């Protein structure tokens, strides 16, 4: 659907290489009709398939301990998302601490840091993204025993959980781990009294018979993703109509800028991606980018421990989990899948016996 107005997709819609959004396409009745037709198909799927399926699952697993007994990290973080009117977002941003929905805090970007105490990077200090460093420092695996494919203990190479063990950094807000994603958007907006969200959430809770506290679970994360889709499906046309109204008075497709090579600049983007809170932080010096750091949703959720020993949400939700068959730990997969992981940039193929698979030399100047 994005490609209808923005040329190639998936590609950045703001760069010439990937295609530039064309105002005339937005004003073309045929293009608008195509968009609305495809949107109607998506809304029908959400209403008639996605919602009923999750409702059925909620009822079926309402008393399943491995589904419900999972808090993980109960600090929630989301940004404003989907502008549907002047200063009016479909989802409002904010922060909830310790699962307490009686208070939603405003976001202070100065409190965001990343550290690498347990990550394979050199500088362990908690740094603001503007000052972030990403210089690799792979320290290897350690000898030990682990469960093999038959569910038995066997000699293996293991992650050094007392040292560095991940390619993912540890983002923190005011020194605390956060959980991001649809669960954060839904709970924070419910707590803020966002009627667009409250109406749909209350209806689902009534039909499923679940309490609001059930959202802090594997089932809750899965349901929150559906509820977010439901809210978006109900109000997409509000955003679309607001865009059309805006085009009647403003047809600019870009903001011109000029870089003075004698000055230094810094700027950021903070917003929500489908998997949660996303931010990019850039410094410019001597007319070129001197530092660029991205703090992405799965980094928040999949982060390793920090210097205080605090776990990220993936790790925290697995503590105490009972595994029925050690050779097939489906319970672990179920929980992690509920976060919808996107960690391609942090996944490295490793041999559990410690053998090098291949070696690559990278020229950073190319």
Regions found by a protein language model. Give the residues of each.
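Active-site bordering "gate/hinge" segments
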Residues: 1-275, 296-366
């Amino acid at each position: 659907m994005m490609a209808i107005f923005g040329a190639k997709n998936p590609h950045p819609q703001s760069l010439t290489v990937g295609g530039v959004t064309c105002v005339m396409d937005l004003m073309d009745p045929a293009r608008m009709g195509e968009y609305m037709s495809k949107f109607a198909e998506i809304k029908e799927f959400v209403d008639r398939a996605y919602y009923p399926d999750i409702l059925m699952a909620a009822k079926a697993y309402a008393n399943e301990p491995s589904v419900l007994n999972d808090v993980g990290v109960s600090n929630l973080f989301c940004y404003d998302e989907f502008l549907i009117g002047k200063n009016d977002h479909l989802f409002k941003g904010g922060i909830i601490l310790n699962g307490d929905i009686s208070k939603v805090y405003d976001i202070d970007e100065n409190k965001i840091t990343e550290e690498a105490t347990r990550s394979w990077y050199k500088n362990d200090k908690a740094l603001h993204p503007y000052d972030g460093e990403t210089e690799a420092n792979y320290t290897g695996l350690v000898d030990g025993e682990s469960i093999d494919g038959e569910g038995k203990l066997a000699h293996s190479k293991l992650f050094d959980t007392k040292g560095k063990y991940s390619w993912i950094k540890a983002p923190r807000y005011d020194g605390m781990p956060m959980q991001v994603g649809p669960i954060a958007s839904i709970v924070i907006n419910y707590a803020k009294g966002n009627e667009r969200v409250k109406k749909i959430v209350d209806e689902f809770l009534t039909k499923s018979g679940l309490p609001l506290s059930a959202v802090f679970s594997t089932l809750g994360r899965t349901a929150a993703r559906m509820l977010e889709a439901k809210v978006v499906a109900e109000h997409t046309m509000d955003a679309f109509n607001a865009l059309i109204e805006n085009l009647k008075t403003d047809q600019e497709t870009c903001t011109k800028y000029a870089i003075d090579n004698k000055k230094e600049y810094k700027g950021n983007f903070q917003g929500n991606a489908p998997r949660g809170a996303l931010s990019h932080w850039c410094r410019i010096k001597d007319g070129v980018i001197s530092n660029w750091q991205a703090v992405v949703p799965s980094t928040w959720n999949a982060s390793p421990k920090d210097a205080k020993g605090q776990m990220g949400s993936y790790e925290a939700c697995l503590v105490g989990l009972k595994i029925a068959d050690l050779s097939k730990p489906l319970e672990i997969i179920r929980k992690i899948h509920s976060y919808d992981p996107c960690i391609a940039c942090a996944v490295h193929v490793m041999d559990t016996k410690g053998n090098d698979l291949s070696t690559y030399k990278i020229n950073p100047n190319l």
